[in-house]
Amino acid sequence: MLGRFQPFSLVRSFRLGFEACCYPNQKCATQTIRPPDSRCLVQAVSQNFNFAKDVLDQWSQLEKDGLRGPYPALWKVSAKGEEDKWSFERMTQLSKKAASILSDTCALSHGDRLMIILPPTPEAYWICLACVRLGITFVPGSPQLTAKKIRYQLRMSKAQCIVANEAMAPVVNSAVSDCPTLKTKLLVSDKSYDGWLDFKKLIQVAPPKQTYMRTKSQDPMAIFFTKGTTGAPKMVEYSQYGLGMGFSQASRRWMDLQPTDVLWSLGDAFGGSLSLSAVLGTWFQGACVFLCHMPTFCPETVLNVLSRFPITTLSANPEMYQELLQHKCFTSYRFKSLKQCVAAGGPISPGVIEDWKRITKLDIYEGYGQTETGLLCATSKTIKLKPSSLGKPLPPYIVQIVDENSNLLPPGEEGNIAIRIKLNQPASLYCPHMVSWEEYASARGHMLYLTGDRGIMDEDGYFWWSGRVDDVANALGQRL
């Protein structure tokens, strides 16, 4: 399984192609070099992979060489309309400074775990990238977590450090009394809090850490907790390769991101959980992540931002698209830069897709996945669009419809949505959670992972969701 494939070869491919397309006067390749076929991500994986070194730092160098687009790595707009931008070079330096804080001040090292309860903010990304550099496993938690749930996740993950903002600090304090592994609390706030280290003060004086951990591709990178509706949330571990590189599938094949694109994910816009899969996938493509924080979802704010800023790619859930369409002045707005719209988080009605297309001239492409697996199926520009379909499976997954006895069902018959696992190309490259399932499935005599969803596959290989059958994870598009 471990071959000579180098992760940065994909980034280098973009470099050659981007030079040819956007810098015609420079000496460069005579033709656009396309990234390797996505199957190579499964068939040949390098033994070592570290997203911070192999992707972020490389885009930082391309940026220094003038071989990136005009937009930053991260673009933030405050509620007051104030703008801040961070280049890949700045993100690299600030993540290195954050790494010094984690290693030297918090005494964290390779193999330790850090829980982070922050909304999408620059500081949250610096800290997560610092964890990647050091081989520390980060555990994202929602700012909506209660003290009881924080205690549960801390005890389950055995985290040695927790990061939170001013609003969450009192909640955390009430939760950590019986969490024996927790040693350090790190506060991201303009104010200080007794018993907490001040991240903003520390990062002003911290030196950039020049070393990084030579992490293995299958070393743990992050732990996510499933939402769970009938049982306790489950831990799902993602590898360095799985989260750092495997999710580039979504940014490339579903969102069609290029280094000249700007992605705005509305799921992160109003205090939602930290969505690292979308962010890392965007940066893998050398594209820009756009942030505009809203206390609550506000259609008018969204429409104003889309018409004012050069956002090329919009990601939202179906309800958000519906609310935007229902705004009384929707038809008066013009989105000059917008060219790609994607949806996840539930089935989207054909009426919403049709109205959006009629007014904006843009299709909405749907995606389907789970915390345990990441993106499984998607519609995209490369296949015929069938409104309300989940689309077709994405590598490395073989998605099938099976009956209660795990027998393959023909097109048109409703059954369980399942993933057929091939041991010679294990899905554990994306998610080590699948390793234990392989062992369990082998003992049962078949290699199937049941998603807990019901659906149908049509004659053309498109999948259609019809409902839940048990509690595996959030129904559709569980965001990471």
Curated annotation (Swiss-Prot):
GO biological process: acyl-CoA metabolic process; fatty acid biosynthetic process
Keywords noted in UniProt: ATP-binding, Fatty acid metabolism, GTP-binding, Ligase, Lipid metabolism, Magnesium, Metal-binding, Mitochondrion, Nucleotide-binding, Transit peptide
Organelle targeting sequence: 1-21
Entry's Gene Ontology molecular function annotations: ATP binding; fatty acid ligase activity; fatty-acyl-CoA synthase activity; GTP binding; medium-chain fatty acid-CoA ligase activity; metal ion binding
Major localization listed first in the record, in broad terms: mitochondrion
Record-linked SUPFAM superfamilies: Acetyl-CoA synthetase-like (SSF56801)
A Pfam family hit: AMP-binding
Family: Belongs to the ATP-dependent AMP-binding enzyme family.
Name recorded for this polypeptide: Acyl-coenzyme A synthetase ACSM6, mitochondrial
Species in which this protein is naturally found: Homo sapiens
Origin organism lineage: Eukaryota, Metazoa, Chordata, Craniata, Vertebrata
Gene transcribed to yield this protein: ACSM6
